From Swiss-Prot:
Topology within the bilayer: Single-pass type IV membrane protein
Keywords, sorted A to Z: Coiled coil, Endoplasmic reticulum, ER-Golgi transport, Membrane, Protein transport, Transmembrane, Transmembrane helix, Transport
Protein's UniProt name: Vesicle transport protein USE1
UniProt subcellular location: Endoplasmic reticulum membrane
Job description of the protein: SNARE that may be involved in targeting and fusion of Golgi-derived retrograde transport vesicles with the ER.
Transmembrane segments: 243-263
Signal among keywords: no
Gene label: Use1
Amino acid sequence: MAQAEGAYHRPLATSRLELNLVRLLCRCESMAAEKREPDEWRLEKYVGALEDMLQALKVQASKPASEVISEYSRKVDFLKGMLQAEKLTSSSEKALANQFLAPGRVPTTAKERVPATKTVHLQSRARYTSEMRSELLGMEPSGECEVDMRKRAAKGSRPADERQSASELDLVLQRHQGLQEKLAEEMLGLARSLKTNTLAAQSVIKKDNQTLSHSLKMADQNLEKLKLESERLEQHAQKSVNWLLWAMLIVVCFVFISMILFIRIMPRLK
């Protein structure tokens, strides 16, 4: 019965280390889904123990399939990232860190229809969104100020209280409207800055393309000129060689004729 409650959802038999890891993982998921005190330290210790058990499971001889180990790692990393997000100061930072968390894809136990880490992820997102909304409206996170104003308006016993509630509500609405206008101006400024940077980048890219095209054109022209000069030098070299050959032939013929004449003239002189 204990194995059915804690065992991971797969047909093969699991080792004792994996059973302990799954049981501790289920415990951590249930603790993460509950409302905890700020000084609660057990969940962080449990997650640290999960990391150690996961590392031991990876090097075990009878370790599970790689998909199962990947799912375990995904859930442990999610719990670790959730604890790190809770330590941040502002709700906007918490919400941003929560967006980058990746919950598990497969339920840890057979009783779960939806992975517990996914439920915890949705709860954290809703809580951080509520805190951000409360900070923007200048209200307490629990919404006690809004409930108190509604109660005062509903009683109707004192006109002064009604006027005070109405003025407080108007103040909240004005503040909210001012924040919205400020955000709209900032977004408009960012859009203008982005447009300016985009136009500047396009201009720089266009100039670079023109420079590159001009350089390629000049390179082609220089290559054509180099080919023409090479052909001209080759023709000139061939002409020089031809003239040299003719000169050598003439010299050889002259020497040959001179030798013949010399041989014929010398006997007559004797």
